[in-house]
UniProtKB/Swiss-Prot annotation:
Record has Nuclease as a keyword: yes
Enzyme class: hydrolase
Entry's Gene Ontology cellular component terms: cytoplasm
Name recorded for this polypeptide: Endoribonuclease YbeY
Pfam families reported in the protein's UniProt record: YbeY
EC nos: 3.1.-.-
Subcellular location as annotated: Cytoplasm
Co-factor requirement: Zn(2+)
Annotated InterPro entries: MetalPrtase_cat_dom_sf_prd, YbeY
Species annotation: Bacteroides thetaiotaomicron (strain ATCC 29148 / DSM 2079 / JCM 5827 / CCUG 10774 / NCTC 10582 / VPI-5482 / E50)
Length: 137
């Protein structure tokens, strides 16, 4: 099990890696999952747009892109997070930057746990799962 935190073209956000990893592990366990190899790549809006275009053929900015490499109950994936979008969203929603960052960090894990947010009613289910996970910090 390894959770890594990397940057591409941005400064590493001020997160407590050990505590964050333990929190991620606990959230995964609450869904009956174990951590495999999880890589967080913090980047800029321009980088996430490039990844979105290249791998998903989507031509828009987003806060997170999750590449799922899970096997059975073991969560594995690459999670690209745009710190620019995190900042914009925090301002737009009146949220603290750190809270929005943690929301997006766990959002990717929840996707790996099988929770979707694109279909009817799924956004509300995801938001409820995010809030429950954030309360576990």
């Amino acid at each position: 099990m390894a959770v890594t935190y990397q940057t591409e073209g941005v400064k590493m956000p001020d997160i407590k890696k050990r505590e964050t990893t333990e929190w991620i592990k606990n959230v995964a366990a609450s869904y009956g999952k174990r951590l495999g190899e999880i890589a967080y790549i913090f980047c800029s809006d321009e980088k996430i747009l490039e990844v979105n275009r290249q791998y998903l053929q989507h031509d828009y900015y987003t806060d997170i892109i999750t590449f799922d490499y899970c096997q059975g109950d073991r969560l594995s994936g690459d999670l690209f997070i745009s710190l620019d979008t995190i900042r914009t969203n925090a301002e737009q929603f009146g949220a603290a930057y750190d809270d929005e960052l943690h929301r997006v960090i766990i959002h990717g894990i929840l996707h790996l746990c099988g929770i979707n947010d694109k279909g009817p009613g799924e956004r509300e289910i995801m938001e409820e799962a995010e809030n429950k996970a954030l309360a576990m910090r």
